[in-house]
UniProtKB/Swiss-Prot annotation:
SMART domains to which the protein is assigned, alphabetical: TPR (SM00028)
Classification via Pfam families: TPR_10 (PF13374), TPR_12 (PF13424)
Similarity comment text for this entry: Belongs to the kinesin light chain family.
Organism of origin: Bos taurus
Biased composition (Polar residues): 489-505
Subunit structure: Oligomer composed of two heavy chains and two light chains. Associates with microtubulin in an ATP-dependent manner. Interacts with KIF5C. Interacts with ODF1. Interacts with LRGUK. Interacts with VDAC2.
Keyword NADP assigned: no
Identification of the protein by name: Kinesin light chain 3
Disordered: annotated span: 1-20, 157-193, 409-505
GO cellular component, one term: mitochondrion
InterPro entries: Kinesin_light (IPR002151), TPR-like_helical_dom_sf (IPR011990), TPR_rpt (IPR019734)
Length: 505
């Protein structure tokens, strides 16, 4: 007797392949059926065993034994099917566990891949910062070498210049272009009244004492005294002469410059606008004093970073000075320098080169190649070339500056020293200029390759040009004029009426 259990649901008919879950469910049903069938067969086997024990030797004994053997075989088949079903269920559970583990490992692999991508990005960022740090270190080393070179050049500065405090490095400053116009126009003997006379208008004698006191207090940093003094004088002038008077405009200009030194740029701007309006009404729109006020206002806007507003003011001041003084006047060249620097801060390098070239031609035509303003303007133009990555043009200008300073002074140059002093200085310069040329060449190449025209490099380049321009100056003249020049330079630097020290602090 053979017992077979058919799988429910038409298993094995080849209609469709069941899913693993369906196979497990059907296998569990088959297991339940086999267990019930096993219990039934065990009951039959028990009854047959009892019947065989109760009957003796008889004719039906063989039939009972045959039945018992069939039931035993059926039980063995049922046990085998149950064992295989249990194995199948265990295998299914194991496969499920493996699938879950597989999904877990896949999720972990995705997470590790994401972490790997993050680590790669972080590594790339770290490498980028490392390269930037290495470049910064290299740039700082080049700047250090350049500053050490500039420090070596200071030994050639005259005593009066070396005693003046160094201003901190700053961005391109409009004040670095040239000193006060009145100081250069009338010389040291008249600098005490530098801001007193503006564009042909002379301050009355009663205001000069007050003006000098304001200069003195402002130079000492005693603004709490200088400001009330200016305001009191301004009120007295308005009561006696009215608001629209040139004296009032002059006092407004002085008060504006005091506010400027206190970094009160808004108040200074308002006062300069008022002074400009008064001067235009009383002196005319094309008076040199109007040009000076326009220039002061433009420089003040430049200190506040408002270069676009400062440019038309500076342009108008240039037009006035060209019309009144002529196109080849030194003040026109100074105004061109200011306008070029404003354009440079706006990235208008074509206009910068044009303005500097024109200023350079004016200085060379008036003072020749040995004019200190030629070196300053060439240095400014070289700085503009550096900002445009025009390294070759910048290097040529720097070499021209050094070559001019290395040449002996022309025959017409003033010389108040003795012959022995002159010969000694000439020998000293000739023995050191070969080293200076080599040092400045290395410094310029490093400057070209790394500094790329930063503000500090521009200021340092200006100081270098100024230092080198003093190499041909007779040292015997320094002690005589040391104190007056320093005192008057401080006064004019504090309260200039045109362009002095209006750069960012």
């Amino acid at each position: 007797m053979s017992v077979q259990v058919a799988a429910p649901g038409g298993l094995g008919l080849g209609l469709e392949r069941p899913s693993p879950e369906e196979l497990v469910r059907q296998t569990r049903q088959v297991v339940k059926g086999l267990e019930a069938l096993r219990a039934e067969h065990r009951g039959l086997a028990g009854h047959l065993a009892e019947a065989l024990a109760a009957q003796g030797p008889a004719a039906g004994l063989e039939l009972l034994e045959e039945k018992q053997q069939v039931v035993s075989h059926s039980l063995e088949a049922i046990e085998l099917g149950l064992g295989e079903a249990q194995v199948l269920l265990a295998l299914s559970a194991h496969v499920g566990a493996l699938e879950a583990e597989k999904q877990r490992l896949r999720a972990q692999a995705r997470r590790l891949a994401q972490e790997n991508a993050w680590l790669r990005e972080e590594l790339e960022e770290t490498q980028r910062r490392l390269r930037a740090s290495e470049e910064a270190v290299a740039q700082l080393e080049e700047e250090k070498s350049h500053l050490e070179f500039l420090g070596q050049l200071r030994q050639y500065d005259p005593p009066a210049e070396s005693q003046q405090p160094e201003s901190p490095p700053r961005r391109d400053s409009l004040a670095s272009l040239f000193p006060s116009e009145e100081e250069e126009r009338r010389g040291p003997e008249a600098v005490g009244a530098a801001a007193a006379q503006q564009g042909g208008y002379e301050i009355p004698a009663r205001l000069r004492t007050l003006h000098n006191l304001v200069i003195q207090y402002a130079g000492q940093g005693r603004y709490e005294v200088a400001v009330p003094l200016c305001r009191q004088a301004l009120e007295d002038l308005e009561r006696s002469s009215g608001h629209c008077h040139p004296d009032v405009a002059t006092m407004l200009n002085i008060l504006a410059l005091v506010y400027r030194d206190q970094n009160k740029y808004k108040e200074a701007t308002d006062l300069l606008h008022d002074a400009l309006q008064i001067r235009e009404q009383t002196l005319g729109p094309e008076h040199p004093a109007v040009a000076a006020t326009l220039n002061n206002l433009a420089v003040l806007y430049g200190k506040r970073g408002r270069y676009r507003e400062a440019e038309p003011l500076c342009q108008r001041a240039l037009e006035i000075r060209e019309k009144v003084l002529g196109a080849d006047h030194p003040d026109v060249a100074k105004q061109l320098n200011n306008l070029a620097l404003l354009c440079q801060n706006q990235g208008k390098f074509e206009e910068v080169e044009r303005h500097y070239a024109r200023a350079l031609s004016i200085y060379e035509a008036l003072g020749g190649p040995h004019d200190p303003n030629v070196a300053k303007t060439k240095n400014n133009l070289a700085s503009a070339y550096l900002k445009q990555n025009k390294y070759q043009q910048a290097e040529e200008l720097y070499k021209e500056i050094l070559h001019r300073e290395a040449l002996p002074a022309p025959l017409g140059a003033p010389n108040t020293g003795t012959t022995s002093d002159t010969q000694q200085q000439t020998l000293s310069r000739s023995s050191s200029f070969s080293k200076l040329r080599e040092s400045i060449r290395r410094g310029s190449e490093k400057l070209v390759s790394r500094l790329r025209g930063e503000g500090a490099a521009g200021a340092a380049g200006m100081k270098r040009a100024m230092s080198l321009s003093m190499l041909n100056t007779d040292g015997s003249r320094a002690p005589e004029n040391q104190f007056p020049r320093q005192h008057l330079s401080e006064a004019s630097r504090t309260l200039s009426t045109s362009t002095q020290d209006l750069g960012p602090r």
